[in-house]
Amino acid sequence: MIISENKPINEILGFLKNVEKVVLIGCNQCAAICKSGGEEEVLKMKEALEIEGKTVLGYRILDPACNLLKSKKDLKELKSELADADAVLSLACGDGTQTIVKNLKNIPVYPANNTMFIGETKRIGEFEEACKACGDCELGWTGGICPVTMCAKGLINGACGGAKNGKCEVSQDNDCAWVKIYERLKDIDQLDNLLEIRPMKDYSKPVSYTHLRAHETLSDL
């Protein structure tokens, strides 16, 4: 899930300083779960903007905002409002906001949210980072625990030696990723995975459009 949070209202108003009429767009999936862009949050934003003298012509909660074709269809329901608006304010994640931009060629689209990370819900209102979308997943040999995300140093070949009582030396609030990986591999009888020396992570590897079309290649097999 994409974790996002609302930008400070002053930053949002800065985007809209020359805007009188605005349309609001939310997302019924990740942003709704994060309480940053569901219908409730869109209505709160509407109220906040109207207090500041803005005219909100309408709103739509996309499901989801990041589906290019579906969003294009759903946004047609706001055709008249969009034609009269000075700008669109997106309460979706960065991906959803860019999807909206692709569907609305002739009107500015501004973000109301900051996209934080890919993560999971620990409990209501509390989220934990789980993936950095590095494009070269390591989970297959680490027991499903990500060293790139969980290790503060992003180490690939085991712990740094600074962990104490299972906690990271960078922050005692965090578990040592490699202790967790060791324990997991022990549980599933795959400790031999730690004997192989892994190459340094290649962060120059581009995540290109080719990756996004991989499903088409697989469907041709």
Question: Residue ranges of each PLM-predicted region?
Answer:
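Mobile "lid/hinge" segments at catalytic clefts and subdomain interfaces of large enzymes
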Residues: 184-185
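Iron-sulfur-associated redox domains of electron-transfer enzymes in respiratory
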Residues: 1-163, 169-172, 177-179
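Conserved small/polar residues in nucleotide/adenosyl-binding loops
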Residues: 210-217
